[in-house]
Amino acid sequence: MSSSAIQVAKTATYLPDLVEVQRASFKWFLDEGLIEELDSFSPITDYTGKLELHFVGNEYRLKRPRHDVEEAKRRDATFASQMYVTCRLVNKETGEIKEQEVFIGELPLMTERGTFIINGAERVIVNQIVRSPGVYFKDEQDKNGRRTYNASVIPNRGAWLKFETDKNDLLHVRVDKTRKINAHVLMRAMGLSDNDVIDKLRHPEYYKKSIEAANEEGISSEDQALLELYKKLRPGEPPSVSGGQQLLQTRFFDPKRYDLGRVGRYKINKKLRLTIPDTVRTLTHEDVLSTLDYLINLELDVGGASLDDIDHLGNRRVRSVGELLQNQVRVGLNRLERIIKERMTVGETDSLTPAQLVNPKPLVAAVKEFFGSSQLSQFMDQTNPLAELTHKRRISALGPGGLTRERAGFAVRDIHPSHYGRLCPIETPEGPNAGLINSLATHARVNQYGFIETPFWKVENGRLIKEGDPIYLSADLEDECRVAPGDVATDADGQILAELIPVRYRQDFEKVPPEQVDYVQLSPVQVISVATSLIPFLEHDDANRALMGSNMQRQAVPLLRPERPLVGTGLETQVARDSGMVPISRVNGMVTFVDATAIIVRDEDGVDHTHYLQKYQRSNQDTCLNQRPIVCQGDAVIVGQVLADGSACEGGEIALGQNVLVAYMPWEGYNYEDAILVSERLVKDDLYTSVHIEKYEIEARQTKLGPEEITREIPNVAEESLGNLDEMGIIRIGAFVESGDILVGKVTPKGESDQPPEEKLLRAIFGEKARDVRDNSLRVPSTERGRVVDVRIYTREQGDELPPGANMVARVYVAQRRKIQVGDKMAGRHGNKGIISRILPREDMPFLPDGTPVDIVLNPLGVPSRMNVGQVFECLMGWAAANLDCRVKVVPFDEMYGAEKSQQTVEAYLKEAAKQPGKEWVYNPDNPGKLQLIDGRSGEPFDQPVTVGYAQILKLVHLVDDKIHARSTGPYSLVTQQPLGGKAQQGGQRLGEMEVWALEAYGAAYTLQELLTVKSDDMQGRNEALNAIVKGKPIPRPGTPESFKVLMRELQSLGLDIAVYTDEGKEVDLMQDVNPRRSTPSRPTYESLGVADYDED
């Protein structure tokens, strides 16, 4: 296959850096966020005012991290740096100043790839989308159907303030959802006179009713207003004027307690047309009066006042890593401040130093808690490079300060017109999180206020101006402009050709002449996310299936020999490169050395730059991370050139699947209901073989009876089983292991109680005994096998940090090659997924006129009802490309080149392919895109021509090997005594309500009885049954299921008198000790149950 790819459509396909949203935010935190927090807490004074502690925020410094990234992963450590800050302790009485550099905690650092290493695991901090602080005007209908209006002032932190109108034209205010207070009471309490308020309002006549109402309640002075305010906000406490004054001051005018944030101030200024500087982060009298004025204008419907849409992206902002971390640091500093104040009061004033006052623990704990257990700090999805990249660009509405799944309604989840070019309308999970977790669109970026912006080209007098950088607009700015889509047709000069252009204006569509267009979108791809933009012919797919296609590409397992798609979209290179999976040259220069582990590039000044490659490392999802060089010694390279392929990459492009020959036809029912029929070639040629690396870990702990030991001497184990263990009892690297094999031998001391009487007798006679130990080795779990690729041992002597109580930890990595097999899940890029139902020999597969057998047979009925026709276009375009020996890049949304363009392009390529010598059969004009296939079993041609072509098919991470599971005996749940569920718990198969109905319908009474008793939760019965099976005796009669006893107990605990009786009215005690039954001979199950049996028992 030639490496040159033909670009079918010419548009801007180069994207901005895709991980910028993470990196820029963390950089902001280091440059500004941290300093801002330290400064806001400085100075801390003690209760007497004698001592002051100043943090010199802009003089903080970070030490070099103790371990580099690789070392941190290996040692299970955190990749973090120590923070030091200069502190000044000022004694006001003596004027003495002590200055010292103090350690204030560890700060995890971001790696180049935008991730964090926490305890050896790579984690990502997901961006959160929350309601922006500011002022919001809403309308509500009361129960009589009358509209009332309200205004909420929402700060970044602090109390909410809500103004409301009611049916009597009075204005009220609520603080933090407490009881209503007359709005004028608040004005008076703030020290505003009636005239102050009236002068500021454009329609004061509406407000006068509220003044009269306040006077009628007898609140005419500031003091009375403050008392009233205190009564309403703190009911049940004795009110006082000073209390009211302090309450008002701390709630709204104290920067420590109330903060609008830079964003809140910007939004309020913009909405109310104020000019308050953005350093004033608390409420001002002007804010409150302007809000009232705007609310009255809304009520009277004058002055251009408008309601707010809270789902508009102009009213929602993104909090990225930097800001989330800053909030967490604030929490830590708050705790620290309390500690410092206490220490100032307790300690000797003269001998105190800053180092004695500052305790790093609270800050360390806050940061650790955020990275370790916050909802937004997630274990990185590393299945393949695309999964990793998407995870870093994810935007979640959940998390602290956000929404919860249960409370989120339809409006929040829905696609909003302002999402255009900012959030992807397609990529979101299926299920309860749909619409709450989104993905950033390809060209979107987050501005300094946290609003998402998207780029446009300017249009002047109908001419597109593409000089310089594009202009980025946020959602509220864009609403005021007329924006044309990115696929408008222009001439070479940039003049727009059509007479009327569809534009978006104020969230609506209209058609205008080119002269009225303000901006044009940068590229047709800018609407969708990275994963979605990898789907070719996306415009021909139904949105639901495109959603599945986007999500399933993230689950594709990296294959042994990746192959880039025949039909791509032109973004594959950038996705591979920005995911951080491929090493990139840092300089212009020449490759001087290449081997499997490193590449050395010598720059123009003769300096060597070494790039180390990852070899067979385990990813978070147990897939294999491996890099292979693609440059040779002596090659010239430029900055930013890809030097090696990572997992699921080929030639620097992302390659998630394989291009295989697909036919759409039914085959003996083997592809019924989305099942897939595949050829043996995929197994034999290792097309879909992937490497998975599993980690097994064991620790030797200190027990009460002495330490556990990792050793080769394991009791009651044959010498053959120890063949692959070294003298320490640890498996050698390169050994092939199967389920049940010992990986690490470990023995645990046995207590006296564990010993049978004969052991005790022997010990009494001979004194020292055969070692009292129990085999506790690490073995390969059932259904697993593979080759040991790495063994790591951690001990205290080597300086490794171990969990408490552990003396030594051993880790074994086992790699396995998994070929494709029946039960594995495969999918295309268009949401067409299925399970492999049969693997046919090559000779039985349908074959083409030139004798080539097809690789995969899909069901044609999967296309029409699902409306993902893109797969057919891809398949035919791939067929043409394979026959022309080239690769094609198709940019989505190609109607700008004319109607039905996809169809024409594909047909043109097919005709071109058929012109090749000996390839006339490739295109049949009577049945375009279809070929006559021949049945491999009979050699007869099929009745109808069949659609055949090359499509990229992925193997997904849902592998049957990880799911298959069986149980003979195993653990039971404590309360119900029923078997546990799931593979991890060695669980059973649930026999649910409907399965019971099915057996009842058949009348299979004995089968049903066994399933509900001895095979499940009849404790005594199942022990007896096992005993009977082992001894070859008939199985005894089942007893009472434990769950029935639990039900009885529950009903009794409700106070109901409920019991079980024989048909003679004699009560049966279900809870009595069940031992007497043991003495009776075990009866066959089929014996009829007589009354006499009870008397025997």
Curated annotation (Swiss-Prot):
SUPFAM superfamilies: beta and beta-prime subunits of DNA dependent RNA-polymerase (SSF64484). One of its GO terms (molecular function) is DNA-directed RNA polymerase activity. The keyword Transferase applies. InterPro entries: DNA-dir_RNA_pol_bsu_ext_1_sf, DNA-dir_RNA_pol_bsu_external_1, DNA-dir_RNA_pol_su2, DNA-dir_RNAP_su2_dom, DNA-dir_RNAP_su2_hyb_sf, RNA_pol_bsu_bac, RNA_pol_bsu_CS, RNA_pol_bsu_protrusion. The keyword Transcription regulation does not apply. It holds the Pfam family RNA_pol_Rpb2_45. One of its GO terms (biological process) is DNA-templated transcription. It catalyses: RNA(n) + a ribonucleoside 5'-triphosphate = RNA(n+1) + diphosphate. Its EC number is 2.7.7.6. GO terms for cellular component: DNA-directed RNA polymerase complex. Keywords: DNA-directed RNA polymerase, Nucleotidyltransferase, Transcription, Transferase. Residues 1072-1097 are annotated as: Disordered. In cyanobacteria the RNAP catalytic core is composed of 2 alpha, 1 beta, 1 beta', 1 gamma and 1 omega subunit. When a sigma factor is associated with the core the holoenzyme is formed, which can initiate transcription. This is DNA-directed RNA polymerase subunit beta. It comes from Prochlorococcus marinus (strain MIT 9313). The gene is rpoB.
